């Protein structure tokens, strides 16, 4: 009898203990782990933007010394699209089309960047025409550009072909040339006609390629910001005209405002054509 009571008491004790432990664990808040695994943020895609060309790509005249239209175009592309556009600037002041082509053949860094590039801009031709004008300054005529224009056209085709050697679908935006002398020498109509002919030839040449686009800038720059007369500077009874879209130290290259206008023109062309990219 005593044994039976002892067994009943033991069972009651164990049952009570189990109930107590269960209730205690249920009421005790679960401790949070000290370290929680952070959520992995979506990795931003980086696109390589290769800028190849002459002083317009290098950014001569840009007071910030950051590279003219190139970095601000990359920033605008990053702001308006998914991913970050990383610019790589291969602009060299004074380069003619044959010098740009020579760099394209020899610079391994340039070749590697083009292989992975998502988009490319090209400024070329201005120094080719400038050399002709300087060589025939006193008697320049349209016939003087015939042979240089033919050489330039061949170089341009080869530049595009070699730029796409390892990246055949690379979209390329070729920027036209402009006449920086117009405001001060509007009577030199042969120079403006030569600029127009040069741009027409560039546009005709690149039309032979898919996903190569022409961006005209002459009308944006050659008459100044207001598109009419620029800024007059009167001195000793004379009134030379300063093109307010050009760098005041040489009146040849764009200034910050000029580069902003170039950037906007290229950006608008990219936005209008990127749906055609493969």
Describe the function of each predicted region.
Residues 16, 180-219:
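Substrate-gating cap/lid alpha-helix
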């Amino acid at each position: 009898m005593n044994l039976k009571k002892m067994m009943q008491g033991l069972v009651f004790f164990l049952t009570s203990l189990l109930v107590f432990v269960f209730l205690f664990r249920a009421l005790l808040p679960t401790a949070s782990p000290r370290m929680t695994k952070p959520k992995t943020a979506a990795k931003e895609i980086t696109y390589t933007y290769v800028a190849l060309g002459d002083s317009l790509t290098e950014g001569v005249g840009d007071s910030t010394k950051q590279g003219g239209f190139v970095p601000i175009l990359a920033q605008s592309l990053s702001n308006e699209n998914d991913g970050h556009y990383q610019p790589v600037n291969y602009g060299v002041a004074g380069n003619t089309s044959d010098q740009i082509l020579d760099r394209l053949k020899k610079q391994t860094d340039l070749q590697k960047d083009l292989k992975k590039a998502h988009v490319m801009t090209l400024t070329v031709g201005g120094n080719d025409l400038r050399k002709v004008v300087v060589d025939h300054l006193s008697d320049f005529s349209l016939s003087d550009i015939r042979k240089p224009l033919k050489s330039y056209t061949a170089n341009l085709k080869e530049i595009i072909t070699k730029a796409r050697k390892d990246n055949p679908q690379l979209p390329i935006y070729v920027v036209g040339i402009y006449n920086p002398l117009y405001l001060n020498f509007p009577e030199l109509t042969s120079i403006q006609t030569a600029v127009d002919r040069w741009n027409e030839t560039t546009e005709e040449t690149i039309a032979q390629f898919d996903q190569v686009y022409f961006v005209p800038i002459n009308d944006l720059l050659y008459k100044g910001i207001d598109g009419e007369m620029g800024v007059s500077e009167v001195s000793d009874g004379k009134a030379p005209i300063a093109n307010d879209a050009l760098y005041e130290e040489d009146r040849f290259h764009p200034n910050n405002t000029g580069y902003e206008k170039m950037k906007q023109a290229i950006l608008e062309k990219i936005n209008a054509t990127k749906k055609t990219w493969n």
